[in-house]
Amino acid sequence: MRGPLEPDSADRPSLAILMREAPVLGDAETAEIKLSQATESLSPAERAALDGLLSRAPIARAVCLGMAEGSPFLLDLVRAEPTRLLRVLSDDPHAHLARLMADCAATAASGSEAEVMRALRRMRSEAALLIALADMGGAFDLIAVTAALTDVADAALRAALAFLLGDAARAGRLKPQDAADPAVGCGLAVIAMGKHGARELNYSSDIDLVVVFDREKAPLAEEVSAAPFFVKITQGLVRLLQERTADGYVLRVDLRLRPDPGSTAVALSTAAALDYYEREGATWERAAYIKARPVAGDLAVGRTFLAELSPFVWRRGLDFQAIADVHAMKREIHAFRGHDVVAVEGHNVKLGRGGIREVEFFVQTQQLIAGGRDPLLRNSRTLEALDALTAHRWIEPSVRDALAEAYVFLRRVEHRIQMVADAQTHSLPESRPAMEGFARFMGYPDRDAFAAALVTRLQTVQTHYANLFEDVAPPAVLDADLMFPPDENDRKTLAALSRLGFRDPAAASGMVRRWLSGGPRALKGESARAHLARIVPLMLEALARGGDPDGALAAADRFLSDLPGPQLLTALDRHPDLVRLLATILTAAPRLGETLARRPSLTDALLDPAFFDVLPDEAGLTAHLEHLLDTADTDEEQLDRARRFRQEQHVLIGVRIASGTLEAARAGEAYATLAEVIIRALHRRVWARFREAHGTIAGAQTAVLAMGKLGGREMTAGSDLDLIVLYDFDADADPTSDGARPLTGAQYFARFTQRLVTALTSLTNAGKLYDVDLRLRPSGRSGPVATRLASFATYQREEAWTWEHMALTRARVIAAEPEFGAKVRDVICAVMGQPRDPRRLAGDILDMRQSIAAEKGEGDMWNLKHAAGGQVDVEFLAQYLVLAHACAHPEIVDTATARVLATAARLGLLEPEDAHVLQRACRLYQNLTQVLRLAVDAHIVPADASPALRALLARAGEMPDFTTLDADLADTQAKVRTIFERILETAAE
């Protein structure tokens, strides 16, 4: 890339020279100061170069000042790296963009994940600045702007996918046709939809993708299954693009345009997708595919898929039913989102009356009507489609000209709105003073001049849109039909409920009327009922999407009945997306819904813009909790704050699982990390308070051992804490503490342990943290609650039963001073490495498994833990492998079952095929267990599970539907039991 101080090329004019228009400044002096401050870290030579460039290009200088005054987002990009501004202004814009994309692709081909993520984000930031400046300065017209934004998005997708596929190839899971370009022939196609597919992308909206794969074309390793492999690739793609880092994010990704997104995986086979569209495809889905374009991966697979889908999108005859269907979509947008009048302040230029969406619907409706018969109308780009409709006499040239001019104007307004703060919005400022500033940013002298231009375009679009639909009889609008007028037998209301799928519309109507009349305590006030009345239509539609509207409405009734007050209703009224999310929770995870009803303040966290970003890591959780505890006034307040912190984080993890934004398997680590952070914080504080009261013993140290699910980092929403507390002090020290209330030796540490357990388990005004189980300590219930390290080592070496050593395979130090923690780990490693008789070990494990089966039963396959071939079988096998082989292979010692199995396979201690079955079973059981613990209190009976829960389980199990999952689970358990018996019975002979 050319350096920032190199002169402009004579034959390739720089961006600064190409500019021909600029925003109008309101306060030039302040704008100068802002720009100067943002670029203050430039070197003297760089400063001179920038000043010289702007002095030679006064319009570019005016654009930069307009940026400083009107766009905090763009100014932040300059402030983060001022040479960025110099680079983009002094270079040919098209060549600069091409180099940015090429550099990113090169990093994806050879860099680490961290390097690729950084390269993607830096490309996006520099490209965003360049394109915005070119837009503001008139160097790019609308087509050039949207094409550049689309090119950058395409490049980011291709680079991220190339890295993921290359990573899979290096791991031996993918066998690419071309190692230098693993996307070629990979079998996976990424389809860009909407504006992205049409190369009409805007600045800040998300990109809509559909990801499909052809399992017959995928060059996968023999043991790799296509569906889970490509689902993981897709999830990785989303993470690489939208995870926020110190360098920002690249693109927000929306995968919800795929078939039946509530119950299908994020990547699905082309056969399954085609079958869905043939059976259930709706008009809106036909419209969505008008703009579809294969953008990354195996482009041949993508083109074949779209070709096979063509008969669904383009009906052979003239399809006038599309007019009513599209108009119904538009009415729902207006009804649900309140964009039904032309306005200026606060007007949504995309969804509002006369907005961009009406131009797009005007075009798409006529394409759907006639595109099946006339392929020349099948153009994905709005302006080109208007030309095609004119050429084929579907619209008059004057209509084309008016709509095209309005569309270009409105898209420029949309872009300028998004430039301000990189926000995913299409609405103009709400206040008149803010509109004055925005009008100048658009290049108008004042608000009134801009408003006149805007309203003219909005009215033009609205007129032509209305003319297209003037002969359409307006069917009952969902919103109006679900307003529940006084007549309790209102036929329109009952008909609307019936259309939504309610089996007993009269009962549903009665339930809603009870809410609106103030039945639940949270709805006693008139204001609360008004909030509810406004959200009822959207709530009913969202509840119905779960597949069991009547059951979902009953869950909503329980939720509203449990609400202690009306505050949540206000939030729901203001945030429609929260209504939809709550409906998902109530239908798929009622247990989580009960938690939210009891503590509605927890929903505040769901409104945080960062909610769907990456989960907070251990360092972030620790910093947050430490701040909360350090600023508490009393010990009691510390305990309350710890409990509220845990509840909030539990809800955030749970909602992420229910909404599909967090893999269920990763949730186990998230729950465990949260527990560790809390235990460490309280361990340190309880230890300090205890020593203040009782003094200390020379060399006194304590350690908390995590066992069980916490030790293996496989916790669920309902897991308790299996802990062991160990201690030590100087051998020659006085065993009596030196405080005002002295305690001696074992009593001292036992009392401390009791204090720690109380801090974790006691019920306060804010609830409780966890249940704690200390029964895995030496001698169980009969042993002391805290054990001296030397005694622990002796017991484990000389007295412990096989089951106790099995439990110890999952032991992990989570709270201790580093030196003492290392000593504890040494003891555990020594115990793990003891020579053992494999025959006796296998016999003990088989006996134990039979005892558990006799006590708990093993015939219910949905008792995932105890079923024959279930979790216990997998965990016992892993523990056998550790205890039998750690003496010769110490590297097999690990607290995580999945990693033990992987290491055993690598060492040749487990047949590859067995390892694959066991590892997949381990992942499947963990995924399903996460969902079940989140969703229900009692054991699941598949026939009784709601459709939404069955869909959530199928998604967690990476299966297309619950029936397939049920069969896969039975098959997996049978295979696991066969392996379990073969390995252990052979060893026991």
UniProtKB/Swiss-Prot annotation:
GO cellular component terms, A-Z: cytosol
Ranges where the record places region Adenylyl removase: 1-473
Entry keywords, A to Z: ATP-binding, Magnesium, Multifunctional enzyme, Nucleotide-binding, Nucleotidyltransferase, Transferase
EC number(s) per entry: 2.7.7.89, 2.7.7.42
A GO molecular-function annotation: ATP binding
Pfam families according to UniProt: GlnD_UR_UTase, GlnE
Catalytic reaction equation(s): [glutamine synthetase]-O(4)-(5'-adenylyl)-L-tyrosine + phosphate = [glutamine synthetase]-L-tyrosine + ADP; [glutamine synthetase]-L-tyrosine + ATP = [glutamine synthetase]-O(4)-(5'-adenylyl)-L-tyrosine + diphosphate
Domain of life, per lineage: Bacteria
Ranges for region Adenylyl transferase: 479-989
Swiss-Prot/TrEMBL cofactor(s): Mg(2+)
GO biological process per UniProt: regulation of glutamine family amino acid metabolic process
Task of the protein: Involved in the regulation of glutamine synthetase GlnA, a key enzyme in the process to assimilate ammonia. When cellular nitrogen levels are high, the C-terminal adenylyl transferase (AT) inactivates GlnA by covalent transfer of an adenylyl group from ATP to specific tyrosine residue of GlnA, thus reducing its activity. Conversely, when nitrogen levels are low, the N-terminal adenylyl removase (AR) activates GlnA by removing the adenylyl group by phosphorolysis, increasing its activity.
Protein family membership: Belongs to the GlnE family.
Protein name: Bifunctional glutamine synthetase adenylyltransferase/adenylyl-removing enzyme
Organism: Xanthobacter autotrophicus (strain ATCC BAA-1158 / Py2)
Organismal lineage: Bacteria, Pseudomonadati, Pseudomonadota, Alphaproteobacteria, Hyphomicrobiales
